[in-house]
Amino acid sequence: MGQKVNPHGFRLGITSEFTSRWYADKQYKAYVGEDVKIRKMMSRGMERAGISRVDIERTQGRLRVDIHTARPGIVIGRRGAEADRIRGDLEKLTGKQVQLNILEVKNPEVDAQLVAQGVAEQLSSRVSFRRAMRKAMQTAMKGGAKGIRVQCSGRLGGAEMSRSEFYREGRVPLHTLRADIDYGFYEARTNFGRIGVKVWIYKGDIVQSRAEREAQEALQRQTRRDRPRRGPRSGSSGTTQGGTDAGRAAARSERRGRGGNAPAAETAASEAGATESTAPESTAPESTAPESTAPESTAPESTAPETTAPEAASSPAPAAESTAPATAASESAATPAAAATPGTPEKAEE
């Protein structure tokens, strides 16, 4: 399929772009006809200008035409007279305001359309077709092309029967979609009839190899990591710190700080608890001594002057009075036991 189809249409969106950029729903037919007429007008009176291609772009009520040429001086004319004439003809044809841009082709030796046009001009001036084809191939290979194929079809050399001949040099991979292949076609008008000239020029692969692509992706990832991060943003309400990046970072650092100081705090608390627990055990006998002298502390409670106050009618006062006899009774019960304990040796002696 790649041997038959036009390389530009076969690679649209991959290595080649559309030469007409516009969108129309109901006027599609009219716009296509206008584009064909514009390109015919450019090629009819500009044979010596070396026009490579014409790009057409439409906007609402406006038309932009980009002319790519190897000889911009011929298209512009003296003091821009030729450019003004072309602009006027385009405005008459389309009825819209036209913006005309004339662009120069930097390397015409590798442009397929210009190479085909050069071969056709030589055939029109009765140059041998083999000589013209080989000269074009040598010039293109010196200009940086990786491969070229030139084909001529018609009554070659004035023969009665038409035939096709082609010459090729280098690589021309027509089936490879990633290959950047330029294609050009031009017709030479001779005394014996028309001779068609087709040129394919291979300029290299546009899509990179897998290793190069992986290296480029790795470099892009590295640049993304090194890219400076933007500052913290405020939360949804603008006042909450927990929803911001700074608040999260602060909370995270606090948690880490607590986790690091927790063992020290636990050891300090355990040591303090150990000292407190040992202190009462050592002073246990001393603590029992004041319990024996409890009547001295209860004496003022029984004679509390608060009972004579008007507030003595409240419920807490009788409770205090009732507790005082209970403590006294317990103390009185304890004292006989204490008195009886020293008497036990006397019974033993008897």
Curated annotation (Swiss-Prot):
SUPFAM superfamilies: Prokaryotic type KH domain (KH-domain type II), Ribosomal protein S3 C-terminal domain
Any one GO cellular component localisation term in the record: cytosolic small ribosomal subunit
A GO biological-process term: translation
Example of a GO MF term: rRNA binding
Pfam families, sorted: KH_2 (PF07650), Ribosomal_S3_C (PF00189)
Superkingdom classification of source: Bacteria
Region Disordered, residue ranges: 211-350
Signal peptide residues on this chain, from the entry's feature table: none
Domain (KH type-2) ranges: 38-106
Feature: compositional bias, Low complexity: 261-350
Biased composition regions of type Basic residues, renumbered to the chain: 222-232
InterPro entries recorded: KH_dom, KH_dom-like_a/b, KH_dom_type_2, KH_sf_prok-type, Ribosomal_S3_C_sf, Ribosomal_uS3_bac-typ, Ribosomal_uS3_C, Ribosomal_uS3_CS
Keywords: Ribonucleoprotein, Ribosomal protein, RNA-binding, rRNA-binding
Family: Belongs to the universal ribosomal protein uS3 family.
Subunit details: Part of the 30S ribosomal subunit. Forms a tight complex with proteins S10 and S14.
Function according to Swiss-Prot or TrEMBL: Binds the lower part of the 30S subunit head. Binds mRNA in the 70S ribosome, positioning it for translation.
Listed name of the protein: Small ribosomal subunit protein uS3
Species for this entry: Frankia alni (strain DSM 45986 / CECT 9034 / ACN14a)
